[in-house]
Amino acid sequence: MKYLVDTHTHTIASTHAYSTLQEYIAMAKHKGIKLFATTDHGPDMADAPHFWHFVNLRVLPRVVDGVGILRGIEANIKNVVGEIDFFGDYLQDLDIVLAGFHEPVFAPSNKETHTAAMINCINSGHVDIITHPGNPAYPIDIEAVAKAAAENNVALEINNSSFLVSRKGSEHNCLAIAKAVKEAGGLLVMGSDSHVAYSLGDFTLAEQIVEQADFPIERLLNRSPEALLAFLSARGHASLDEYSVLLES
């Protein structure tokens, strides 16, 4: 199946990434990607953009050359309370909010602490998608997290980058997550976690996990722009009408 949506990308605003937003738009056009989210790292990361970078995403057009661009962030889960490093009314101005564990912000601890932090973040209502929850550096109670995510209409990510250059050993956890989310009645999304435009929309290995779990396509947010936009609307993101042109093409 050709997936036309990517929810997880990084630009040169995160200085360990290597492509501009315009390069992503051009690559999306080239690959036939209809909708992608620009989700640079939250400001507590050492080389992340300033807080105001995310505030000023409002200047971005939502559709360029027939490609939809979601204004987003990959925030950092900061502590066991589940707080993230973007907050207040500014959250409402973003189209999509991702959050995950990153070692420079939240050092690996133990399974109980990781699970509590992730579930508290899910329960906060501030986050739409939890990124790379299968990271073996942060063991979690997978069934408990999947249940909390399903109850809160939060998607868990199968991160393609985790099978390539980062988070080695994620395969077993990601398959268990896909199966647990399926059992809990929740939602999955595949994210490229692209740090260079060439890997935009690359779900090659994540798709294998989804297929092994026999995960229902109707609960996979990448299946269409309509599916992701409906999810974000249900999550309370209001300003999505500008993407309607994507649904007409």
Swiss-Prot record:
Entry EC no(s): 3.1.3.-
GO cellular component: cytosol
List of residues binding Zn(2+) 3: 74, 102, 132
UniProt binding sites for Zn(2+) 2: 16, 41, 195
Disulfide bonds: none
Binding, Zn(2+) 1: 8, 10, 74, 193
GO molecular function: phosphatase activity; zinc ion binding
Cofactor: binding details: Binds 3 Zn(2+) ions per subunit.
Keyword Metal-binding: yes
Required co-factors: Zn(2+)
This protein's name: Probable phosphatase Shal_1519
